[in-house]
Amino acid sequence: MIGIAALVVGIVLGLVFHPSVPEVIQPYLSIAVVAALDAVFGGLRAYLERIFDSKVFVISFVFNVLVAALIVYVGDQLGVGTQLSTAIIVVLGIRIFGNAAALRRRLFGA
């Protein structure tokens, strides 16, 4: 319940204040969001399978975001940032859809 309230407050604050993302951070934002979504869907799946551990969830959430950002940063330094960003999005997208399929099977039996 606290998480839902925090989400609503965050959305409202974002709509009211219209924050701008610094140009330096923009390449990493989309990767961070997708990495965070991967952790959230993994957490939902674990919750439905009754193996959810909040410590594992928080560590997974932070670690996914940091590793994805680090990979993009290294790619930018090597001049292949766009290709690595695409690779990260594809890999995390596959994981998200895998978790979504498991959630669908668990919730709807299909």
How would you name each of these model-derived features?
Residues 1-5, 28-29, 53-63, 86, ...:
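Cytoplasmic-side transmembrane-helix entry/capping segments in multi-pass membrane proteins
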Residues 1-26:
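Membrane-helix boundary elements
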Residues 15, 31-42, 68-69, 91-98:
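Alpha-helical transmembrane segments of multi-pass membrane proteins
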Residues 17-26, 44-55:
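Short juxtamembrane and helix-loop transition motifs at transmembrane-helix boundaries
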Residues 24-37, 85:
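Structural signature of hydrophobic alpha-helical transmembrane segments
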Residues 41-50, 97-105:
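C-terminal ends of transmembrane helices
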Residues 71-85:
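Membrane-helix boundary connector in multi-pass membrane proteins
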Residues 86-110:
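Canonical alpha-helical transmembrane segment with a positive-inside/aromatic-interface signature
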